[in-house]
């Protein structure tokens, strides 16, 4: 997996939360790599640990209760888990920035929106206040908000506009890595498309790499180069967009596609994945997915299963691939 | 921050140094006062705080000096007839502003005071007539025994010129004939007096209340009893009459301090409500059941006097022989017998109403415990001063209490103590405070008030005791604690400190 | 093109099953500090209930010999100026003090929260009128209000609670109003309104949980004061009459002896502190349990 | 905004009228007799009745109320104290100077000591600093003020002799102990409220956003968290200031400070009607003004609230 163009390489990342005496394993030994200018999609259900991965990269996990007991996050040759807080502050917002999930709460309610953008510009570009204001206005216009709304407060903006502000804020300093945490979930469909186009556009312009966190496979299809399917804090399947979309192997991934409305088939009902995600404080032994897996066998319950390359860099954490292939064949 | 702190500290030190420095010049005394005098004008009423500064601020026609009445501003008193008296003033009285005091000022003071209505005793002064510069003739509407003296002692005298020159009726800056002049009055905090170097009276004629042994007097108002103790300990005050009994041991026999004990002129007594306890045996039984020694121990730290009548034995019209009489001393057998006679059985409940104060609460609790021994319940109903004062005289409230713990005192005569609650003429509803409408009682008290001869006094006392309409409990002792700056403490007949008369 | 509900996280599911109240209780039960506070409170309440049978001495029994007795094995907390056992008086006094303290705090809080939510939620005219009425009430000294209540309505436990609680209401309303104003305009409230949530539901399950924290803090801290205040009411025909003990009255009785016989003050003072402490522990736990931001 | 303030100021007229009528009615139904405290304990019932008649206390309710309102709102005269014989307004202002000093010093202590303590506790949530701070806070709210006051006096005045035990005649030194004793509970409550409010805010998403921008801890804390956290605290401070300007009876009694609290309590106890009614009116006015100020400060700190004051045009 060695590649000279690698911008970010996450190895064995583990995140734990301590809550009321219980240890919750939010992220377990996650490893992946991201090349310059590329986009990786982290896909999974709410609570699967996607956001924790992004926040661990930026080191903005709430500590305590969160803790990163192990792993490496190599970004441009530095292990982000080891750099000093002061250095980290120089990276945040400048080299790596993040688009937050919930635009309603991501903005400081008592600060002018423009000010919140100008703040990050002034901080990292060491420019005058006036310049930072100019830049902030430009950023607002770039995301389609008139510059004169610089002086307004978040409550005067609609949800979609707030999300654009958040995006403008994240892109203000032309980061090399953008962490987009469900940037469109809170938006309605038309705006979703606009925002995605905008992100794609900006990405191309600035040659920014991106980690796209979503549970929406549609978005993945639109923007991602590689995809990691996260379940219970683990990468279950990893591959290029084509690999995942055309040849999903892990039962959970298959399930995700199964719960997609397929306009081409005339299936009356969606087939959602049965059951509930596991309690992260009490993960099942063996494969974390086995209680919900229609293909689960004895060995799935016994021991932890390793991520295996099943060809062409397509990784999958399953020991019953053959049975699944057979089952799939039968279905068809 | 550090700089600021050091600045503050320096300021504090400078300020405290300054205050020490000023205290060094001349002889001065600081008196701790528990009550706030409020308005120190001459014709205000006798609220509790005012009595403490009254004799330092004002002079009257007459004062009580020890056990005798002496003229202060008045040189001679001449009787014209039963209701007419001539008062002759010293002819060299000047006030602190240099105004001469004449008979017309006396007329002015009595008339103004009477019109203000704050000194209700003056209602028996019909008029004052100016006979000459220094002689005024008083016409009274009625005079009972002792009334003449109390009337002449009641009204503070100032010159009309000074009174009219004051912007606020002397409420804060009285100009008087007293040897001490108010130089600073921080309302609610301190009153400072300077000695008047031109005091009018010759030393050999000066009455006790007008002595002036110290150059400067400051009254410091300290409402909190513990802080009074602390202030004395820190020697911020030199003398106080308001040191709680339990702290006296901190000053008695302690280096640098001394304590003088003076019996208070008030007496605590029980008033029985005749409407709910009409049976004399029942009232007597309660009197027998209460052990005054317990009350003295619990409420007064062991220092107090048994009352021998409703009022204490310091008054001139107190009959000596009562001291040796039996007066409902605690007697379990008699109490039981009398309760049985009255048909009072265990489970009976009395409601005891009292004015809330630490000592009253303890007295009430002691009575409650004492009657509890007979299986009798006592419900305590404490009221704050204002409510008690109202309910005490309120006819409509009489259905709400059975026993009242009250206290009373007078500046001169025992009959005046009795008058407070036992003379139905003084109540708005024609009965005593205890709702007794007893013609014999009334005729006896009227006789005693008109002529307080030992026979009349004894007749009333014996009848009251026999009926036990009211039962005298105890007189407390005031503790005058002072630093050794004061070598001998002096008090007026109301038990208040006379800083000018103390010896230093 | 979006994924339909893939699954719910476990907390959300539990909330469906248990309702909001059960959920808060569940989280509260897991909070050790809060549970310690609650346990001590329960112990105190049990002591209060059982006190007529378990006090070492009769609370009203006076004794000349034991006046101001210092703490000893006979009298663990010593005796007061009437020679009464302080421990017994504190145990028995828990009845009046806890009852009055808790009840009037609850009344003040409930009324305050109701008013505060109305005012904060509706704003405008309602806000203006209610707040101005509170301005008027708050201008009247508490003592006068109590005397007026006593005079107009008579004595009795209900009026005592009224007198004690009336002073706490305006503060609660103001606090709640203040914090509701900040959440009032947030989208989730509007969203809840738009999906036709009843007003009651919007207030109780969306607005209050997000704005109640300052009220909890202030209420749990205020109970000590309420217990102290109860003492002054007994002079105006309300409250508890002597010799029935009550912590505030014990404290004010001991006040003048504080430097001479400090134990008269210390033990009732400690009792009050204990209650304040426990309620604060409980209050903190409750606030955390109600805080929706901690759900996940 | 100006319209809002103007409207609120106009509202003050009915509020003042309401206070006047309410306090008058309360004094009317409150038992207790100003005559008896004026004439002293040795006055008889007949003498008291005469005095009451003279003071006009026996007139019917409506007559007295009318007289009072006329005097207060038409002639702007609060009357003369029964007890002090001086004008109520002058008396109150004289007392106010002491109360104001104490209130300002205490508020300063409360804000400048309590707030940092609360912030420290919140930022070290569950750490040692938090525990110590919260313990002090609990101590602060549960220690009776008089107890603390007397202990301070015992140590610093009686034993060490550094400061006076009571009174106001030693300049600033007179106010040190009263202010410490009086502000302890305020500091404690300020610290707790700040902590609680900070904890809420620190968990907010926008704080994470701010952190993700690369702002330093300090900037995040002071520029983003604190202003948001202080919003509910404005009420606490405003209310506290209003209360303190009404006087702190316990502290004033212990330290023999002739402040507003003692003036009013004495007046209530002796039923000095003009002082009680005039005092309540003036203190009510001051309190209302402070509450208005609180609401204005709210609007300045929080644009959402300002929008609500200015009408509902808010969102675009």
Report each predicted region and the residues it spans.
Chain B
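Structural transition elements
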Residues: 8, 304-341, 359-360
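Periplasmic binding protein-like
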Residues: 31, 372-424, 455-456
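N-terminal lobe/hinge region of extracytoplasmic solute-binding protein
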Residues: 32-80, 88, 111, 175
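A structural "hinge/loop" feature
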Residues: 34-52, 73, 99, 147-156, ...
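Surface-exposed binding/hinge segments that line
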Residues: 78, 82, 120-163, 168-169, ...
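Aromatic-rich, solvent-exposed beta-strand/loop patch
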Residues: 96, 139-156, 175-224, 248-266
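Periplasmic-binding protein-like
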Residues: 277-316, 362-363, 461-474
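Extracytoplasmic/peripheral linker and loop segments enriched in polar/acidic and small residues
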Residues: 379-388, 417-484
């Amino acid at each position: 997996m060695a590649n000279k163009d690698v911008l970010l390489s996450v190895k064995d990342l583990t995140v734990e939360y301590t809550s009321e005496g219980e240890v919750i394993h939010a992220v377990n030994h996650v490893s992946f790599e991201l090349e310059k200018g590329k986009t990786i999609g982290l896909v999974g259900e709410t609570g699967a640990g996607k956001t924790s991965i992004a926040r661990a990269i930026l080191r903005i996990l709430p500590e305590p209760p969160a803790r990163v007991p192990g792993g490496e996050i190599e970004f441009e040759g530095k292990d982000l888990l080891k750099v000093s807080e002061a250095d980290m502050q120089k990276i945040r917002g400048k080299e790596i920035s993040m688009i937050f999930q919930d635009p309603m709460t991501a903005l400081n309610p008592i600060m002018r929106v423009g000010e919140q953008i100008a703040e990050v510009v002034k901080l990292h570009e060491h420019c005058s206040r006036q310049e930072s204001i100019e830049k902030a206005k430009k950023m607002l216009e770039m995301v389609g908000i008139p510059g004169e709304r610089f002086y307004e407060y978040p409550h005067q903006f609609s949800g979609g506009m707030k999300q654009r502000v958040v995006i403008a804020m994240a892109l203000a300093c032309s980061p090399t890595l953008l962490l987009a945490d469900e940037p469109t979930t809170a938006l309605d469909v038309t705006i979703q498309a606009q925002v995605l186009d905008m992100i794609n556009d900006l990405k191309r312009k600035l040659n920014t790499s991106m980690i796209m966190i979503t549970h929406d496979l549609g978005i993945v299809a639109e923007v991602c180069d590689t995809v990691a399917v996260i379940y219970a804090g683990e990468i279950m399947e990893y591959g290029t967009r084509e690999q995942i979309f055309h040849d999903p192997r892990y039962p959970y991934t298959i399930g995700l596609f199964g719960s997609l409305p397929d306009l081409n088939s005339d299936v009356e009902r969606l087939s959602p994945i049965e059951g509930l995600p596991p309690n992260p404080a009490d993960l099942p032994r063996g494969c974390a997915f086995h209680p919900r897996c229609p293909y689960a066998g004895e060995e799935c319950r016994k021991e932890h299963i390793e991520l295996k390359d099943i060809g062409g860099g397509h990784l999958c954490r399953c020991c019953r691939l053959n049975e699944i292939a057979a089952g799939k064949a039968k279905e068809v | 921050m550090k700089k600021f702190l050091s600045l503050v500290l320096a300021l504090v030190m400078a300020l405290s140094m300054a205050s020490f420095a000023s205290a060094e010049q001349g002889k001065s005394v600081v008196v701790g006062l528990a009550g706030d005098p409020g308005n120190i004008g001459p014709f205000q009423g006798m609220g509790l705080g005012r009595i403490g500064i009254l004799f330092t601020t004002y002079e009257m026609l007459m004062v009580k000096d020890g056990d005798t009445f002496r003229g202060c501003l008045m040189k001679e008193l001449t009787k014209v007839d039963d209701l007419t008296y001539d008062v002759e003033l010293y002819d060299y009285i000047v006030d602190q502003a240099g105004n001469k005091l004449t008979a017309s000022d006396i007329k002015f003071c009595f008339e103004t005071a009477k019109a203000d209505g704050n000194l209700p005793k003056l209602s028996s002064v019909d008029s004052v007539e100016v006979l000459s510069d220094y002689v005024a003739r008083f016409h009274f509407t009625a005079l009972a025994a002792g009334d003449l003296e109390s009337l002449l002692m009641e009204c503070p005298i100032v010159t009309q010129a000074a009174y009219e020159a004051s912007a606020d009726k002397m409420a804060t800056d009285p100009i008087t004939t007293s040897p001490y002049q108010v130089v600073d009055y921080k309302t609610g905090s301190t009153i400072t007096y300077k000695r008047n170097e031109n005091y009018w009276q010759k030393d050999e004629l000066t009455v006790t209340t007008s002595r002036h042994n110290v150059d400067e007097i400051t009254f410091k108002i300290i409402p909190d009893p513990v802080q009074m103790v602390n202030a004395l300990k820190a020697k911020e005050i030199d003398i106080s009459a308001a040191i709680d009994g339990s702290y006296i041991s901190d000053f008695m026999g302690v280096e640098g301090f001394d304590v003088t004990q003076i019996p208070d002129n008030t007496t605590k007594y029980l008033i029985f409500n005749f409407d709910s306890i009409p049976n004399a045996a029942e009232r007597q039984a309660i009197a027998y059941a209460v052990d005054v020694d317990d009350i003295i121990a619990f409420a007064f730290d062991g220092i107090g006097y048994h009352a021998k009548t409703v009022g204490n034995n310091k008054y001139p019209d107190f009959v000596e022989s009562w001291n040796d009489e039996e007066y409902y001393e605690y007697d379990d057998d008699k109490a039981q017998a009398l309760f049985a006679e009255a048909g009072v059985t265990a489970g009976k409940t009395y409601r005891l109403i009292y004015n809330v104060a630490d000592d009253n609460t303890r007295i009430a609790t002691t009575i409650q415990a004492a009657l509890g021994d007979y299986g009798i319940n006592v419900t305590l109903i404490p009221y704050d001063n204002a409510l008690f004062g109202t309910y005490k005289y309120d006819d409509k409230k009489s259905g709400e209490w059975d026993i009242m713990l009250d206290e009373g005192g007078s500046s001169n005569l025992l009959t005046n103590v009795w008058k407070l609650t036992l003379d139905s003429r003084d109540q708005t509803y024609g009965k005593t405070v205890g709702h007794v409408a007893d013609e014999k009682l009334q005729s006896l008290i009227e006789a005693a008030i008109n002529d307080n001869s030992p026979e009349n006094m004894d007749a009333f006392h014996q009848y009251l005791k026999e009926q036990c309409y009211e039962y005298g409990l105890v007189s407390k002792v005031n503790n005058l604690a002072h630093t050794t700056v004061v070598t001998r403490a002096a008090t007026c007949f109301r038990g208040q400190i006379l800083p000018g008369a103390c010896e230093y | 093109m979006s994924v339909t509900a893939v699954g719910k996280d476990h907390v959300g599911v539990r909330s469906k099953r248990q309702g909001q109240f059960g959920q808060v209780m569940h989280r509260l039960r897991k909070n050790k500090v809060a549970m310690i506070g609650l346990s001590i409170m329960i112990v105190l309440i049990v002591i209060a209930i059982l006190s007529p049978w378990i006090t070492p001495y009769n609370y009203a029994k006076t004794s000349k010999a034991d006046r101001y007795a210092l703490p000893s094995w006979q009298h663990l907390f010593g005796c007061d100026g009437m020679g009464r056992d302080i421990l017994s008086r504190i145990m028995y006094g828990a009845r009046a003090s806890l009852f009055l303290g808790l009840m009037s705090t609850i009344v003040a809080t409930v009324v305050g929260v109701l008013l505060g939510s109305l005012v904060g939620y509706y704003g405008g005219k309602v806000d203006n009128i209610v707040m101005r009425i509170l301005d008027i009430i708050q201008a009247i000294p508490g003592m006068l209000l109590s005397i007026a209540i006593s005079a107009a309505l008579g004595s009795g436990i209900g009026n005592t609670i009224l007198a004690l609680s009336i002073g706490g209401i305006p503060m609660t309303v103001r606090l709640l109003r203040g914090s509701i104003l900040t959440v009032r305009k947030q989208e989730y409230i509007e969203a809840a309104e738009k999906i036709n949530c009843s007003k009651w539901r919007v207030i109780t399950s969306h607005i209050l949980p997000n704005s109640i924290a300052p009220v909890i803090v202030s209420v749990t801290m205020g109970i000590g004061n309420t217990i102290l205040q109860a003492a002054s009411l007994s002079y105006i025909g309300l409250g508890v009459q002597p010799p029935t003990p009550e912590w505030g009255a014990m404290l004010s009785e001991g006040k003048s002896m504080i430097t001479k016989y400090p134990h008269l003050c210390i033990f009732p003072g400690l009792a009050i502190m204990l209650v304040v402490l426990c309620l604060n522990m409980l209050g903190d736990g409750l606030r955390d349990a109600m805080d929706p931001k901690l759900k996940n | 905004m100006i319209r809002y303030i103007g409207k609120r100021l106009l509202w003050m007229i009915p509020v003042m009228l309401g206070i006047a009528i309410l306090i008058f009615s309360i004094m009317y139904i409150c038992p207790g007799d100003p005559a008896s405290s004026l004439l002293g304990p040795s006055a008889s019932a007949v003498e008291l009745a005469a005095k009451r008649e003279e003071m006009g206390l026996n007139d019917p309710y409506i007559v007295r109320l009318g007289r009072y309102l006329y005097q207060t709102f038409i002639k702007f005269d609060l009357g003369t104290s029964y007890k002090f014989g001086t004008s109520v307004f002058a008396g109150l202002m004289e007392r106010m100077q002491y109360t104001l000093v104490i209130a300002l010093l205490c508020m300063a202590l409360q804000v400048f000591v309590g707030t940092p303590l609360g912030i420290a506790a919140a930022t070290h949530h569950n750490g040692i600093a938090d525990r110590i701070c919260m313990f002090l806070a609990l101590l602060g709210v549960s220690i009776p003020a008089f107890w603390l006051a007397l202990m301070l006096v015992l140590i610093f005045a009686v034993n060490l002799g550094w400061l006076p035990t009571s009174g106001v005649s030693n300049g600033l030194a007179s106010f040190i102990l009263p202010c410490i004793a009086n502000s302890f509970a305020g500091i404690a409550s300020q610290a707790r409220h700040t902590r609680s409010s900070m904890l809420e805010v620190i968990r907010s998403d926008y704080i994470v956003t701010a952190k993700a921008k690369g702002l330093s801890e300090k900037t995040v804390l002071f520029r983003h968290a604190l202003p948001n956290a202080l919003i509910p605290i404005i009420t606490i401070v405003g209310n506290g200031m209003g209360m303190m300007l009404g006087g702190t009876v316990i502290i004033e009694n212990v330290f023999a400070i002739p402040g507003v609290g003692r003036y009013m309590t004495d007046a209530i106890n002796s039923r000095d009607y003009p002082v009680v009614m005039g005092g309540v009116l003036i203190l009510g006015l001051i309190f209302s003004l402070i509450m208005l100020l609180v609401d204005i400060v709210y609007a300045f700190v929080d644009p959402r609230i300002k929008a609500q004051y200015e009408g509902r045009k808010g969102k675009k």
